[in-house]
From Swiss-Prot:
Similarity annotation: Belongs to the ATPase alpha/beta chains family.
Residues reported to bind ATP: 151-158
The protein's name in its UniProt record: ATP synthase subunit beta 2
EC number per UniProt: 7.1.2.2
Top class in the EC scheme: translocase
GO cellular component: a single term: plasma membrane
Membrane topology field: Peripheral membrane protein
Subcellular location: Cell inner membrane
Pfam families (alphabetical): ATP-synt_ab, ATP-synt_ab_N, ATP-synt_VA_C
Gene name tied to this protein: atpD2
The organism's taxonomic lineage, starting at the top: Bacteria, Pseudomonadati, Pseudomonadota, Gammaproteobacteria, Vibrionales
Highest taxon above the source species: Bacteria
Amino acid sequence: MSIGKIVKVIGAVVDVEFEQGKGPKVYDALKINDGSDGSLMLEVQQQLGGGVVRCIAMGSSDGLKRGLEVESTGNPITVPVGEETLGRIMNVLGHPIDECGPIGEQVSYEIHRDAPSYEEQSNSTALLETGVKVIDLICPFAKGGKIGLFGGAGVGKTVNMMELINNIAKAHSGLSVFTGVGERTREGNDFYYEMKEAGVLDKVAMVYGQMNEPPGNRLRVALTGLTIAERFRDEGRDVLLFVDNIYRYTLAGTEVSALLGRMPSAVGYQPTLAEEMGVLQERITSTKNGSITSIQAVYVPADDLTDPSPATTFAHLDATVVLSRNIAALGLYPAIDPLDSTSRQLDPQVVGQEHYDVARKVQQTLQRYKELKDIIAILGMDELSEEDKRLVSRARKVERFLTQPYHVAEVFTGQPGVFVPLKDTIAGFKALLDGQYDDIPEQAFMYCGNIDEVLEKAKKL
């Protein structure tokens, strides 16, 4: 192991000098033993020549000074993988942070790995039922697919993610890996206790690099979580990988890029934005051994879906769930936009002709209502034809029937959550669009599960 010394510290960036010809490679991990309890890890980012390497710190660089000894580990950051990680909370380096003692005898993987080759990859068209009406109907998820939850601040990304975890991870017999990338520590804490109460903690591995961590940590924590998921997949398991939030991964890359002195590109993002996103996303894939189904929350800055970060993420996904501030403002939750959300699985050959026809009819009805809104605002409902009046009435019922109470929001709403089977969802919307419930008031459709609940509620109105 070669030993170097610190020659320069600028925030999270540390320059280390090694003997000429004995310097570490790019992405190698360096260890600083400063005499305190923990040791700080650095990751090599650039070779500056003359034996000097520029590194990013994986923890706080407070207290570092020039002349401190740095030891090269000779390989990239390695993290524990396998059964021992289940039920544990780890940081970017794979160290336990849940005060439950060390992680037992373990296999370790490097966090920088190649994506599976073309021959190894497999695609699946099996559907993953979520129990959320609007998702199952409009943008169905594929087992082994990549799903993005897009939304601005405060429209419900994390609540939707938690509901999906509740409905899928608890019912799903496989394993889950939850990666918190630059999000609130409180959310990570809530998630841990929720899983514990549900009795599924022994099927979940958690990796957290939260908002207060330095950028190097937030940039690498997604890779740590993915590496743990890859190990389970390679053992032939079906894994759920939850990433909250993929935008913070991009943001950490922007910070690191600026610290390293690279020229920024559009909107101040790093010039390597597409490559960094590709390196992560291409590894999240299913092979002939096992599958990784990934659900990622994507923050949309200023509600602008054309921002380079969400726009780059779009290209990698099989299904996109777009959360709308306008729908949230109407008090319709989940605030998922059925006209903006898409899925590659919404194909008659995958979901069946009936499902496809009902989903498209729902979208056509809502689209026509959207077009008529301007006329209604100027001239009022009376100026519409009888057919359009009927369509508007049905569209408003469809909008309300797309809402449903969530299990994870029970504590706020006081209304018990519901899981709606796909066949009930299709049957309900089909009957609604065929005019079977034209005489039922629209408020009866608010926050119900299947159509039977609507009929029960209508009797009480």
